[in-house]
């Protein structure tokens, strides 16, 4: 949004118009849960996909090279309410020396739809909202980390969504892992935008 102010000094015949001030409405963190489909990649090691939306950075989702098959691996979600999505954040596995290696996502796509997802889990009716890539601040080879790399990973990687729209269902597809493994692990996802229902908004989620 943008706005200007107009002021007419006393005894003046002209009004003074300020330069336009440009701002953004606040984005809210939307709740979500797993939407079960047969094409959701199976879990291994007891790292269930529900961990991606529990607010706990010590738990996460882990697929396997065996049950999951080759990449891409994917998971489907239902938002608590239709939301005009603008940004999202992904927290990779960054405890100890895990950041930017092994099954942490390196390249991935995000998809959205408002239609009830097909029971066969196909992409019919879905819109790709963007392609995203994790970037290691130091640029050093896999297995070598700086303090800045670790801090960046633990803070979560934020992305603007290029195809802004109102969606109820989301799907993430991991195309490539940092370690080149055919398995995926990360800890948490967060989605931010503008709710499109007239229900109350929980300000604690800002």
Segment roles from a protein language model:
Residues 28-46:
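Flexible, small-residue-rich N-terminal segments that precede or flank a structured functional core
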Residues 7-16, 44-123, 155-205:
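Aromatic, loop-rich ligand-recognition surfaces of beta-strand-rich domains
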Residues 124-160:
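Extracellular carbohydrate recognition and processing domains
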Residues 1-27:
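Activation corresponds to long, low-complexity, non-globular regions
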Residues 35-36, 53-55, 134, 140:
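Amphipathic alpha-helical interaction segments
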């Amino acid at each position: 949004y943008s706005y200007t102010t107009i002021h007419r000094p006393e005894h003046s015949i002209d009004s003074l118009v300020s330069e336009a001030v440009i701002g953004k409405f606040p984005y809210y963190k939307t709740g979500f849960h797993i939407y079960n489909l047969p094409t959701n990649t199976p879990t291994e090691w007891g790292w269930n996909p529900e961990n991606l939306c529990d607010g706990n950075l010590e738990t996460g989702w882990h697929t396997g090279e065996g049950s999951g098959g080759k990449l891409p691996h994917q998971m489907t979600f239902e938002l608590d309410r239709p939301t005009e999505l603008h940004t999202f954040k992904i927290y990779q596995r960054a405890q100890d020396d895990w950041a930017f290696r092994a099954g942490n996502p390196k390249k991935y796509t995000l998809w959205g739809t408002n239609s009830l997802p097909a029971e066969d889990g196909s992409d019919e009716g879905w819109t790709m909202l963007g392609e995203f890539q994790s970037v290691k601040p130091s640029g050093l080879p896999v297995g070598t980390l700086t303090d800045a790399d670790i801090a960046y990973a633990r803070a979560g990687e934020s992305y603007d969504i290029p195809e802004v729209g109102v969606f109820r269902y989301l799907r993430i597809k991991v195309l490539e892992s940092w370690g080149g493994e055919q398995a995926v692990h990360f800890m948490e996802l967060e989605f931010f935008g503008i709710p499109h229902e007239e229900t109350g908004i929980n300000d604690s989620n800002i």
